[in-house]
Design a protein with these regions (language model features):
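Secondary-structure boundary elements
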Residues: 6-73
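A broad, structural surface signal
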Residues: 13, 36, 40, 80-91, ...
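His-Asp-centered catalytic microenvironments across diverse enzyme cores
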Residues: 2-19, 44-47, 102-254
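Residues at alpha-helix termini
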Residues: 18, 91, 262-263
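Active-site neighborhood of thiol-dependent amide/isopeptide-bond enzymes
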Residues: 54-121
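Extended, charged low-complexity segments
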Residues: 234-299
């Protein structure tokens, strides 16, 4: 659907409003400065979250549904967030490409070929002849776009790194998250173009398989200039880098949903009391099992 006021889709203005911007016409021509502002706003205001997967009713990942989620005050995981943001940037005139990526828990779990990259939808944007890594769906990583150049990239208190992977292919790269972070190790991606449809089967597996981390554990993330905030099961962490990290255990469903609303800017009014209680029971048990496992390993 296209707005009568201009040639932008009708969803573009309310999407931008969610990010704190006026209508598309007010942004002017695509620029690196505007891209940075849009990216920062997205990771600050639109959370990475898996509430629906945890409730056993995963949503689709097509662009229209992903955008509708954001307009309804929700977030999603990479397939939702990067799919929606890529669509927004495209209608705003940016040169956007979708790529296949793979999140690694460690180097040992990295795939041997780019054909095996299926678990992450990565984006790049070319501006003024330079390609940038754009990612609003990689948990507690990018706060703003990162130039696709080999080396270390500092964003606020966090240190990221990009390296080419010639052993995989001429278009393969590895993004390393901050060494002090524990949520994931790295993300490999290939610059070969992809489409959102390439991730359908991976989404089905990641959103329904009992072995999927998104089915096993509750996850909630946001970034801003000075910190990363996240909830893993019932533990709420604020990480300000350089060892400045505080974690507390949430005590109730009410506290979880208050944090999700007040800190992560989510509208969860569609989740009723029964589902909230069932979800909290699941999250609390998973958190207790995780702590018991790690306490046992340390003894």
């Amino acid at each position: 659907m296209t707005s009568k006021a201009n040639d932008h889709p009708a969803w573009a203005a309310p999407y931008l409003a969610k990010l704190g911007f006026d209508d598309p016409e007010s942004l002017g021509a695509p620029s690196l400065d505007t891209l940075r502002r849009l990216h920062r706003a997205h990771v600050e205001l639109i959370a990475f979250e898996n509430f629906d997967i945890q409730l056993g009713r995963p949503q689709g990942i097509d662009p229209a549904e992903s955008i509708a989620r954001i307009l309804a005050g929700r977030g999603g995981y990479c397939f939702n967030l990067n799919n929606a943001f890529g669509e927004l940037l495209t209608v705003l005139g940016y040169d956007v490409t979708v790529h296949r990526g793979q999140v690694n828990g460690s180097v040992a779990t990295a795939k041997a070929t780019a054909d095996e990259y299926t678990t992450h939808m990565a984006l790049t944007v070319v501006i003024d002849g330079e390609r940038w890594s754009v990612d609003v769906g990689l948990a507690n990583s990018h706060h703003e776009p990162i130039p696709l150049r080999e080396g270390v990239h500092i964003q606020g208190p966090f240190r990221f790194e990009l390296r080419p992977l010639p052993e995989i292919g001429p278009d393969a790269w590895r993004f390393f998250t901050d060494p002090a972070q524990t949520t994931f190790h790295s993300m490999d991606f290939t610059l070969a173009p992809a489409t959102w449809e390439d991730f359908r089967s991976s989404h089905t597996e990641l959103s329904t398989s009992p072995q999927s981390p998104f089915v096993r554990w509750f996850e909630l993330f946001r970034r801003d200039a000075g910190c990363a905030e996240f909830v893993l099961d019932d533990e709420f962490t604020r990480d300000e880098g350089a060892g400045r990290r505080t974690t507390r255990i949430l005590e109730s469903a009410q506290e979880l949903f208050k944090v999700a609303t007040d800190v992560f800017h989510l509208d969860l009014s569609a989740i009723d009391d029964a589902d909230r209680a069932a979800l909290w029971d699941r999250i609390q048990r998973a958190g207790a099992e995780w702590r018991a496992k790690h306490e046992s390993a340390e003894n």
